[in-house]
């Protein structure tokens, strides 16, 4: 560019183009966290959320409740690490776990629907997976996570495979769950 003004104009054009291309992936341009954005959307819609977490071990609930005022939209949740608690607290049928395994799309859906119903929430999230470093198999490797989001119009489920260590997998699993809510409410 021949001048600072031309360079600035060109930079603004590129920023606009990037924003257009990445709009589905950018949730904030002012530094707000994903949990803040999700809380904002839930409040705008007068909606509530409950979670049933397995491999994330409460990280999702911790992230949501780290935001002041989250009690207006977050009803609570359960860390259902054992199969018995999946059945007892989130109403996952034991037969479903026996048939498909605890780490499955079917169990993620049952977790989301069960916790939504139990807490009488607008939305329920179910997360189950293999955070590692052990416990993986060729069919269900470390990093495999199923996320389900249940609402009054049905339930959607997403399968993801995350790399990295246990904490990284747990973080990305919680990020994916929050992003599912964000996209649903946009």
Regions found by a protein language model. Give the residues of each.
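Short beta-strand-to-loop capping motifs
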Residues: 1-3
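Short alpha-helical segments enriched in small residues
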Residues: 6-186
